[in-house]
Regions:
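A structural "domain/chain start" motif
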Residues: 22-92, 199-202
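Generic short beta-strand segments
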Residues: 59, 127-131, 165-167
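Short secondary-structure boundary motifs at beta->alpha junctions and helix caps
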Residues: 77-86, 154-195
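Structured, soluble extracytoplasmic/luminal domains of envelope-associated proteins
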Residues: 85-107
């Protein structure tokens, strides 16, 4: 092969590589998107005189959801997640933080801590069984399965406990809508939880 032929061959290979890169999106990559949960406007119980110190313990989560990727399912047998659509932080941390914000706004307790700092009067525990997008044919839903427990630190018997598991319809497969729907579900759960806690007299 002559020198001119070698140069031409290298040029053709380079152009082919550039064309393949453009075809497969190598030159322009989609950005990673991050989503979070927000506090909704809910009906708060009549707090009365705030008393006692509550610690919101670190929430736990089912092992399959221990990731920042937003999970979606198309059947009971599927378990998939988005590569570029992520929760801004671990879902159990987000849910615990938002739950703490609801409790602070309720005024039921004199103080609410999310970090251990001495022995509290009460503890709120949470476990997430599922936080996901559910796709069923042409319908989409957001699902949040969450167990909440209020107890005293020295007691194994809960003062109040309930497992919530509901879905809310969303209009499309858009993670932002899923985050909004899960926020609304969490708000609904916390409204019931705060009412029950207030009624139980803590």
């Amino acid at each position: 092969m002559t020198r001119a032929a070698k140069v031409l061959f290298v040029a053709i290979v380079a152009l082919a590589a550039m064309a393949l890169t453009a075809c497969f999106g190598g030159s322009t990559s989609e950005p990673t998107r991050y989503f979070t949960l927000a506090v909704e406007n809910i009906n708060m119980p009549n707090a009365g005189d705030a008393s006692g110190r509550l610690q919101v313990r670190k929430f736990t989560i089912d092992q399959a959801y221990q990731r920042n990727n937003i999970v979606y399912r198309e059947s009971a047998y599927d378990f998939m997640f988005y590569d570029l659509d992520l929760w801004a932080s671990r879902p159990e941390q987000m849910v615990a933080q938002v739950a703490a914000e609801y409790i602070v706004k309720s005024g039921l307790f004199a103080s609410v801590d999310t970090r251990a700092s001495g022995k509290p009067d009460f503890e709120l525990l949470g476990h997430i069984d599922a936080i996901e997008e559910v796709d069923e044919g042409s319908s989409q839903y957001a699902r949040l399965s969450l167990k909440l427990t209020l107890q005293k630190p020295d007691s194994d018997a809960p003062l109040w406990e309930k497992r919530f598991d509901e879905r809310q319809s969303v209009s499309s497969r858009e993670p932002r809508l899923v985050a909004e729907a899960i926020s609304k579900l969490l708000g609904k759960y916390m409204e019931e939880a705060l009412g029950a806690i207030a009624g139980a007299g803590k």
